[in-house]
From Swiss-Prot:
Pfam families per UniProt: Bac_DnaA, Bac_DnaA_C, DnaA_N
UniProt-recorded name of the protein: Chromosomal replication initiator protein DnaA
Region annotation (Domain III, AAA+ region) ranges: 123-339
Similarity field: Belongs to the DnaA family.
Organism of origin: Prochlorococcus marinus (strain MIT 9303)
């Protein structure tokens, strides 16, 4: 059979698409391109060195077998890496008004197909699967690493440490790993737990003299997914217990996946031995998505809601909300709800006033609150997180807690953790003090308004 390299690779891809899971195919096989076919050797180019190494280790034999079957002769496969460029993705054309999608089309955004009943553990969100994760340059490395861990737990990257800002998809990827393993083995012992839950379970075990049961529970897992590990900072006993849990699981070859808003080395008051353990596998960073990725995220969200939106509206929302995916999807949800309630068409002109920063306001990150309050009150972010009782620092810290309660979805305990481990009663007191002083202290009111303006927090927002 006479085939060019591109023709052979296209046929191999078609064959493998039926034999591999969709996440595997879309992550490893589809992005690879053929750069040549000579003397029985098919040369493939992967997007980056990470992908090329994974293809060589795990899929070269599968590709060679498929190629030989199609070509009629043995085929050798070599894989090279090409660093990813910023090629622009092109979105398909969209209608100028919202149109419900047929039910059959809407199924394309569903979770990965299941071959039978599956066991979903408490805490795993059914929406957080690989098929629903939109991959962009900001998240390609983390997504590929997560899929690699899901396919071969305990082998390549253990632990896998995913870090990135609020609302960028860390929890989605973590839980997608859990869902994937449960698809492969419904009896797998998968545990998804926040650091807060781990700490609370530990406290209860100490109180009830149940430490052995606590250890047995966590160390019997095949896969443990630990979210928000940054909140372990300063908790010496929790760190001690987590260190031994980590060692027990790692020595048994069990996969550990950890998520944080910052790399291990930047978590304050974290034991050096934990920093070392967390860094011994792979640290995968997720950045804020670029415009094209944000547009793709909105389009997929619209498909899941069975709506087609005007391209200019997608572009407007993607350009307006830039810091994280959570606020991006929230803006789309508000826009769809607004159009449904008012009966107005889904156009930029109709929804822009509702999404204006002087109206509802947008979500901000805890770090943004700390940075802007520090700027206005002339203190440092380190001062804000410290235990300093200097009047200027104390007042700035209280305002930071007050605005963090207004501008984020963090609970009182989480806000306290962000400010260096303060408890929730301290946060409540700070909020009450600021609310009292705002009506009688014009200078404070002016400073708070300035921070609000910088953060685009509306004074009418919740809490």
């Amino acid at each position: 059979m006479v085939l060019t390299g591109n023709e052979l690779w296209s046929k191999v891809q078609q064959a493998l698409q039926h034999n591999l899971s969709k996440p595997t195919f879309e992550t490893w096989i589809r992005p690879a391109i053929c750069s040549g076919f000579r003397d029985g050797e098919l040369t493939l180019i992967a997007p980056n060195s990470f992908a090329s190494n994974w293809l060589r280790k795990n899929y070269v034999q599968t590709i060679e077998a498929a190629a030989a079957k199609i070509y009629g002769q043995p085929v050798r496969v070599s894989v090279q890496a090409q660093e990813e460029d910023s090629a622009e993705r092109v979105l398909p054309p969209m209608a100028s008004a919202p149109v419900p999608l047929p039910a059959a089309e809407a199924t394309t955004a569903s979770a990965a197909p299941s071959s039978g009943p599956r066991r979903i553990l408490p805490g795993l969100n059914l929406r957080y699967v690989f098929n629903r994760f939109v991959v962009g340059p900001n998240s390609r490395m983390a997504h590929a690493a997560a899929l690699a861990v899901a396919e071969a737990p305990g082998r390549e990257f253990n632990p896998l440490f995913i870090c990135g800002g609020v609302g960028l998809g860390k929890t989605h990827l973590m839980q997608a790993i859990g869902h994937y393993r449960l698809e492969i083995n419904p009896e797998a012992k998968v545990a998804y737990v926040s650091t807060e839950t781990f700490t609370n379970d530990l406290i209860q075990a100490i109180r009830k003299d149940g430490m052995q049961a606590f250890r047995d529970r966590y160390r019997a897992t095949d896969l443990i997914l630990v979210d928000d590990i940054q909140f372990i900072e300063g908790k010496e006993y929790t760190q001690e217990e987590f260190f031994h849990t980590f060692n027990a699981l790692h020595e048994a070859g069990r996969q550990i996946v950890i998520a944080s808003d910052r790399p291990p080395s930047q978590i304050p008051k974290l034991q050096e031995r934990l920093i070392s353990r967390f860094s011994m596998g792979l640290i995968a960073d997720i950045q804020s998505p670029d415009l094209e990725t944000r547009m793709a995220i909105l389009q997929k969200k619209a498909e899941q809601e069975r709506m087609m939106l005007p391209r200019d509206l997608i572009q407007y929302i993607a350009g307006r909300f830039t810091s994280n995916i959570r606020e991006l999807e929230g803006a789309l949800t508000r826009a769809v709800a607004f159009a449904s309630i008012t009966g107005l068409p889904m156009t930029v002109e109709s929804v822009a006033p509702m999404l204006d920063p002087n109206g509802q306001g947008v979500d901000v990150t805890p770090q943004q609150v700390i940075d802007k309050v520090s700027e206005v009150f002339d203190v440092t972010p380190q001062d804000m997180r410290s235990s300093s009782r200097r009047r200027a620092v104390s007042h700035a810290r209280q305002v930071g807690m007050y605005l963090m309660r207004q501008g984020t979805d963090l609970s009182l305990p989480r806000i306290g953790e962000t400010f260096g481990g303060k408890d929730h009663t301290t946060v409540m007191y700070a909020i009450e003090q600021v609310e009292k002083r705002l009506s009688s202290d014009p200078q404070l009111a002016s400073q708070v308004r300035r921070v609000r303006d910088l953060l685009q927090i509306d004074s009418r927002r919740r809490r």
